[in-house]
């Protein structure tokens, strides 16, 4: 197998990564500008180039049309500024970059993993994941993280030749950092990072890594994701009028939140109940009790932003300090060590996730809407399957023509649906013959 390896680095941490980490699966010619024959040395690191490729990708832009938590009809029109999967990914990338700079990882590797981590999400988020996993059962199901790998290494058009699709052709280090669940599907396991027909490229990415062990950059990305969505989903819930943190002052509500955290996130129930009580007494939390976006003045909005800033900083600092206490000041890269997240911090994050789950995601009207969304995706999938290849976009129609069997053709239809934004899925479904 021919590999492309780049040298040089715009950040000192890039020099700590060996040739295997810098390698790309497909060889690439020198980058041209179309301005003549003048040749200059590439000053960017390979990891900086990775970041640029993801940042400029259509797959990343599509995340602007995919809801994070609060969407149309759920209070977004009140606050007017709901988060999308794109804004969430930008926040994850920024948080991860800061942690990487503290720990000695290459910031571009972690930043890119943060940008890319949700690229595989289908319309309607985790609800869409569930529908596509059911619809695509005969070809191995669906998982957003496995779809991320597929997009980065195959579906996003950037590098390729002949019958070989290279996707964005990112470095091994960046692809490994993007693997939140570095294992294929095992039995009925819900979370996994690669489909069976992506096994070869997954094997290349993971070559030399301990089975099932995430590199430090992936661990930083994952913690940054937890921090971002636990804090910011609560912020969006407050802005939409669905969350009031005064609920943390109720012992009954704290017990209910601890139960949710235990059941859905594997957290220790007693620890969650304890930290929920402690969170309720934080001055930053007390300052936003009773927040109402319809009446809040500047002081109230400043208090809400102070809360999110303090919580993000709290979780970043706790994890970086604990990791440095264990590993010292030597740079941590690839598989040289693990991120240390103290149990108390993990419990606090689990409680915040449970706040959003209890007061936003478990709303009966939302659950009814989600059932309709799953039905829509099933109907759309069946219609595309019946009408393929004419029902597919031209690129996916090419994939359909090259597919060797029914399972591969089903995977093409799943790929097609997964690429759609929320509104595209609704529009495509509306065009179906009645």
Where are these regions (language model features)?
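Short alpha-helical catalytic segment bearing the HExxH-like zincin motif
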Residues: 110-115, 222
């Amino acid at each position: 197998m021919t590999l492309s390896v780049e040298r040089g680095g715009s950040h000192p941490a890039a020099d700590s990564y060996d040739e295997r980490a810098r390698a790309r699966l497909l060889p690439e010619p020198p980058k041209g500008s179309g301005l003549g024959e003048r040749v200059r040395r590439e000053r960017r690191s390979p990891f900086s180039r990775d970041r640029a490729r993801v940042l400029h990708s259509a797959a990343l832009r599509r995340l602007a049309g995919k809801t994070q938590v609060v969407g149309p009809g759920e209070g977004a029109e009140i606050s007017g500024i709901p988060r999308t999967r794109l804004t969430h990914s930008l926040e994850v990338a920024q948080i991860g970059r800061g942690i990487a700079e503290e720990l000695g990882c290459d910031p571009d590797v972690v930043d890119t993993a943060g940008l890319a981590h949700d690229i595989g999400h289908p319309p309607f988020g985790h609800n869409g994941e569930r529908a596509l996993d059911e619809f695509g059962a005969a070809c191995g199901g669906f998982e957003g993280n496995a779809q991320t790998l597929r997009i980065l290494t195959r579906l996003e058009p950037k590098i390729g030749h002949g019958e070989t699709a290279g996707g964005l052709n990112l470095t091994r280090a960046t692809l490994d950092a993007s693997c939140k669940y570095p294992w294929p599907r095992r039995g009925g396991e819900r979370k996994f990072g690669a489909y069976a027909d992506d096994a070869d490229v997954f094997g290349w990415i993971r070559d030399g890594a301990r089975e099932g062990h995430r590199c430090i950059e992936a661990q930083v990305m994952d913690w940054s994701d937890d921090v971002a969505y636990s804090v910011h989903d609560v912020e969006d819930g407050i802005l939409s009028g669905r969350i009031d943190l005064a609920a943390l002052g109720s012992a009954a509500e704290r017990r209910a939140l601890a139960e949710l955290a235990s059941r859905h996130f594997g957290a220790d129930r007693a620890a969650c109940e304890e930290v929920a009580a402690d969170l309720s007494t934080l001055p930053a939390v007390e300052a936003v009790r009773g927040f109402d976006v319809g009446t809040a003045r500047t002081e109230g909005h400043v208090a809400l932003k102070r809360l999110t800033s303090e919580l993000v900083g709290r979780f970043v600092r706790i994890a970086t300090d604990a990791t440095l206490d264990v590993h010292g000041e030597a740079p941590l890269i690839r598989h040289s060590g693990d991120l240390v997240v103290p149990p108390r911090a993990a419990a606090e994050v689990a409680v915040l996730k449970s706040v959003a789950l209890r007061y936003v995601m478990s709303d009966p009207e939302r659950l009814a809407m989600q059932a309709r969304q799953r039905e829509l995706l099933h109907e759309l999938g069946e219609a595309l399957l019946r009408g393929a290849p004419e029902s597919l976009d031209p690129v996916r129609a090419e994939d359909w023509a090259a597919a060797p069997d029914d399972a591969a053709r089903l995977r093409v239809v799943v790929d097609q649906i997964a690429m759609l934004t929320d509104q595209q899925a609704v529009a495509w479904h509306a065009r179906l013959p009645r």
